[in-house]
Amino acid sequence: MSGKKRTASSTRWMQEHFDDHYVKLAQKRGLRSRAAFKLEELQEKDQLIRPGMTVVDLGAAPGGWSQIAVKLTGDKGKVIACDILPMDPIVGVDFLQGDFREEKVLEALLTRVGADKVDVVLSDMAPNMSGSDGVDQPRAMYLVELALDMCHQVLAPNGSFAVKVFQGEGFDEYMKAVKDAFKVVKTRKPDSSRARSREVYLVATGYKL
């Protein structure tokens, strides 16, 4: 067997082992998805969420990020989650099922937020992938643009934003838009993010619009 083949085989094995580790760890800890570890890593580096904060979690189902957020905000905080898909209840999380592009769903979400605005907007949204970059990338960019629009509607001054973005066409323009809206923007690739994935997370702090 050639060195190249050994390397490819080893890489596949390592990736499978890596994936199994986070899937099993999520199950062991009672977390609903391996994605929860991504938010934990972002929190460890950037301290986005503190006790008493109000957090909006977009694309929340099955609830991995909401599980982490509600622990971090504590009894005096508030987590408002929204997804088109259903999500089993999480104690302390106010879940709204629906498409926030629809006016009635958006109004319901804004009612839950109230007049005080929110401290953090989270988005781990991703489209159903077809395998075609020409289809998937525009869909993915559309979702992250919606998430940034939500910041403009609900985020308090100096608030924070964490969003999953897929690198590709439209990424640079989106990065500029986020930098225009926030004082500091960092790009993160959590260890729990699959190495083969083009996903990265933008962590933006100091909302200024």
UniProtKB/Swiss-Prot annotation:
Catalytic residues (positions): K164
InterPro entries: RNA_methyltr_RlmE, RNA_MeTrfase_FtsJ_dom, rRNA-MeTfrase_E, SAM-dependent_MTases_sf
Domain of life: Bacteria
EC nos: 2.1.1.166
Subcellular locations according to the entry: Cytoplasm
Binding-site residues for S-adenosyl-L-methionine, renumbered to this chain: G63, W65, D83, D99, D124
Keywords of the record: Cytoplasm, Methyltransferase, rRNA processing, S-adenosyl-L-methionine, Transferase
One GO CC term on file: cytoplasm
Reactions catalysed, as given in the entry: uridine(2552) in 23S rRNA + S-adenosyl-L-methionine = 2'-O-methyluridine(2552) in 23S rRNA + S-adenosyl-L-homocysteine + H(+)
Enzyme class (EC, first level): transferase
One Gene Ontology term of the molecular function aspect: rRNA (uridine-2'-O-)-methyltransferase activity
Family: Belongs to the class I-like SAM-binding methyltransferase superfamily. RNA methyltransferase RlmE family.
NCBIfam families noted in UniProt: PRK11188.1
Functional description taken from the UniProt entry: Specifically methylates the uridine in position 2552 of 23S rRNA at the 2'-O position of the ribose in the fully assembled 50S ribosomal subunit.
Protein name from the UniProt record: Ribosomal RNA large subunit methyltransferase E
